[in-house]
């Protein structure tokens, strides 16, 4: 009886390990960094009321079976009137192992979940770069990657519907 329980517990542990192994962070790293302050030092004499523009983009590269690199590109541009105070670009990347799952779930994981994990690293890097440029602190607000991904999926679906009649013609 005790041997039977040990066997069942071992099988259950193995099944749980397989289920838990569907997602694994292999590495998070900074792929590229750029900080420019083209109008320094004159920009430091101006009143600091910048317009901040934030651009976010993601890309995914398949490295091998079920292993993907996700790159989150964040660009922050601060302008005072017509002058650029600073331009900060960060590519934060991660290598993720994603086990077997439906394509829709995998797309959501790569397009939303992974960028959401990378964003705090990119935000910290940008904050540090802006600080080293001796500009006032810049604290980027959280980003809703689920909403961004949902908009992307909806746009793709609309494009597919719009292109379908052209293919039939």
Curated annotation (Swiss-Prot):
* Keywords recorded for this protein, A-Z: Chaperone, Cytoplasm, Protein transport, Translocation, Transport
Q: What is its main location?
A: cytoplasm
GO MF annotation list? unfolded protein binding
Q: One of this protein's GO BP terms?
A: protein transport
One Gene Ontology term, aspect cellular component = cytoplasm
Task: Supply the Pfam families for this chain.
Answer: SecB
What SUPFAM superfamilies does this protein's entry cite? SecB-like
Q: Where in the cell is it found?
A: Cytoplasm
Function according to Swiss-Prot or TrEMBL: One of the proteins required for the normal export of preproteins out of the cell cytoplasm. It is a molecular chaperone that binds to a subset of precursor proteins, maintaining them in a translocation-competent state. It also specifically binds to its receptor SecA.
Quaternary structure and interacting proteins, as annotated: Homotetramer, a dimer of dimers. One homotetramer interacts with 1 SecA dimer.
Q: Which NCBIfam families match?
A: PRK05751.1-4, secB
Which family, according to the similarity comment? Belongs to the SecB family.
Quote the PANTHER family the UniProt record gives: PROTEIN-EXPORT PROTEIN SECB (PTHR36918:SF1), PTHR36918
Name this protein carries in UniProt: Protein-export protein SecB
**Which gene holds the coding sequence for this protein?**
secB
